[in-house]
């Protein structure tokens, strides 16, 4: 009897240690659940890496060697990019299938559920559910919840790289329901998350379809296909006459600058180079494709001012002017996301100047590849300023700036721009000369306006990506809400006939 009494006391002490005191419990759970610690109901294993100096450990691909990047497989981890030889098996800590793997260094909280035997590197802590206490998939879903993710971040070390060590992992709060309810929770979550997964897949398919259609529409626009019927029914001005007018405008602008220089007592500016129309047209052997007869191939720099000189303007130094940082330029719309204002005196040096109707084109990676481009509309003053990582394109009267905007949004143009970038990794930029020399298919002015009208109409129906992104965000919020309810016992999975969870703890203790 004395021996039995001693066992009973020992069990009570173990229970007391395993259970979370009421005043420390994160939130209220059903009466037949208990709050315990992760390490009480799971074996936690930190991975390790066999020596890279031992070639035999890496010779054959016998055993999956999981690293953080592999965790992107989520609910169904079935392979790893890297494997080890079976001769290294004594040098690693093997993980059975149905293990939940968590990144504990760097991208803390990234999680996957393994459907295969594997091992992992030291950046991963793995949870092996204790038999007849925790249903393995319950671990996976719990770790994905906002509650558990927050715990991990709060308990990680505040160093240059966040680290959640094994000891801290073991102490994390764990809401333990009866075993049968764990299974019902998992079944319901599997069902609901299969629905949200399918919804996300459909959204992704639609996004790809929309993007492909936009690419096709823009391609047809700049080959004259969109306006084929219109062209046959309407007379247009001569495009070559448009090019002639460029020279007239250059000379007029130069004369105005000369008068201003004389007035200011400055040296006259250099006379602009005047080209014959035939010299403005791209040679036939350099033309990317055949255009309609009324169109011509020109270099972008012939019809657009690329990074024009700053304009002198009489503004008080403390006057506020428009300021546009890179983050305020949209990847999908010509409109500025948000207007900022700064004092004129703070922007005169070290920033890029622009005026109304200029186009801002992000020249640095990855902003350029992401499509950051905008048309400047209203300005508080006659000028504004922005990041030095913009190319400024100023349309002349022979080119519609919205047509130019759509040209710059083409996938093909951006791929060419990316290929011609210069600079070191992370700081690669599109050179000014690339912008100036790029071939541009110039239609007659009237046809430009018709192309813009058609594109506005068609692309308005195609620009649904923003709405889809908002829908994706709502699905993400829904998933978080579902998990939140699941681990509070609010998913309708309870059964009063279930054996209380405390009995599970007693069995394993």
What positions do the PLM features span?
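Amphipathic alpha-helical coiled-coil/heptad-repeat segments
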Residues: 1-12, 151, 171-241, 248, ...
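Phosphate/adenylate-binding "loop-and-lid" substructures adjacent to NTP/NAD/dNTP-binding pockets
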Residues: 9-13, 235, 240-289
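Non-catalytic DNA-recognition/assembly elements of restriction-modification systems
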Residues: 19-48, 175, 179, 183-186, ...
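A short glycine-rich beta-alpha junction/loop motif
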Residues: 20, 104, 118-126, 136-137, ...
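Sequence-specific dsDNA recognition surfaces
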Residues: 23, 39-54, 69-97, 115, ...
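Short, ligand-facing micro-motifs at secondary-structure edges
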Residues: 49-53, 71-83, 97-121, 125, ...
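Short coil/turn segments at secondary-structure boundaries
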Residues: 51-59, 154-156, 228-235, 257-263, ...
């Amino acid at each position: 009897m004395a021996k039995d009494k001693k066992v009973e006391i020992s069990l009570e002490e173990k229970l007391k240690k395993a259970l979370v005191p009421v005043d420390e419990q994160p939130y209220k759970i059903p009466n037949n659940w208990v709050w315990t610690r992760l390490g009480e109901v799971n074996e936690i294993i930190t991975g390790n890496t066999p020596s890279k100096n031992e070639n035999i450990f890496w010779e054959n691909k016998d055993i999956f060697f999981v690293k953080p990047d592999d965790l992107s497989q989520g609910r169904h981890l079935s392979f790893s990019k890297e494997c080890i030889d079976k001769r290294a098996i004594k040098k690693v800590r093997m993980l059975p299938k149905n293990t939940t793997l968590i990144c504990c260094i760097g991208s803390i909280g990234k999680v996957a559920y393994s459907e295969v035997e594997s091992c992992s590197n030291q950046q991963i802590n793995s949870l092996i559910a204790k038999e007849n206490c925790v249903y393995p998939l319950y671990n996976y879903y719990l770790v994905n919840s906002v509650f558990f993710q927050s715990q991990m971040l709060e308990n990680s070390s505040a160093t240059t790289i966040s680290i959640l060590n094994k000891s801290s992992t073991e102490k994390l709060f764990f809401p333990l329901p009866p075993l049968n309810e764990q299974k019902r929770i998992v079944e319901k979550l599997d069902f609901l998350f299969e629905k949200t997964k399918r919804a996300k897949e459909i959204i992704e398919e639609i996004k790809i379809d929309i993007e492909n259609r936009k690419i096709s529409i823009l391609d047809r626009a700049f080959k004259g296909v969109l306006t084929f019927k219109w062209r046959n029914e309407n007379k247009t001005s001569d495009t070559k006459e448009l090019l002639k007018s460029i020279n007239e405008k250059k000379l007029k602008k130069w004369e105005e600058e000369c008068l201003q220089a004389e007035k200011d007592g400055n040296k006259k500016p250099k006379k602009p180079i005047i080209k014959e129309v035939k010299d403005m047209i791209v040679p036939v052997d350099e033309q990317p494709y055949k255009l309609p007869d009324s169109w011509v191939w020109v270099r972008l720099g012939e019809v657009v001012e690329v990074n024009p000189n700053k304009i002198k303007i009489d503004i008080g130094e403390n006057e506020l002017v428009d300021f546009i940082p890179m983050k305020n330029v949209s990847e999908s719309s010509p409109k500025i996301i948000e207007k900022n204002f700064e004092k004129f005196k703070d922007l005169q040096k070290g920033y890029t100047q622009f005026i109304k109707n200029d186009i801002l084109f992000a020249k640095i990676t990855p902003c350029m590849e992401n499509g950051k481009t905008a048309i400047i509309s209203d300005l508080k003053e006659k000028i504004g300023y922005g990041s030095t990582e913009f190319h400024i394109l100023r349309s002349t009267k022979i080119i519609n700036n919205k047509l130019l905007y759509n040209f710059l949004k083409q996938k093909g143009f951006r791929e060419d721009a990316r290929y011609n970038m210069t600079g070191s990794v992370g700081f690669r930029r599109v050179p000014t000369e690339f912008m100036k020399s790029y071939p541009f298919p110039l239609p007659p002015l009237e046809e430009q306006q018709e192309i813009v009208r058609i594109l506005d109409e068609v692309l308005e129906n195609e620009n649904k990506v923003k709405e889809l992104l908002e829908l994706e965000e709502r699905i993400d919020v829904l998933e978080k809400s579902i998990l939140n309810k699941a681990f509070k016992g609010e998913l309708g999975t309870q059964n009063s006939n279930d054996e209380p969870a405390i009995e599970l703890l007693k069995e394993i203790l």
